[in-house]
Curated annotation (Swiss-Prot):
May act as a neurotransmitter or neuromodulator. It comes from the Eukaryota. Keywords: Amidation, Neuropeptide, Secreted. This is Carcinustatin-19. The keyword Repeat does not apply. Disulfide bonds: none annotated. Its main location: secreted. The modification Leucine amide is found at L10. GO terms for cellular component: extracellular region. GO terms for biological process: neuropeptide signaling pathway. It is found in: Secreted. Belongs to the allatostatin family.
Length: 10
């Protein structure tokens, strides 16, 4: 997902 725990949606 784009805004996951490690992917901060950057």
């Amino acid at each position: 997902a784009p805004t996951d725990m490690y992917s901060f949606g950057l």
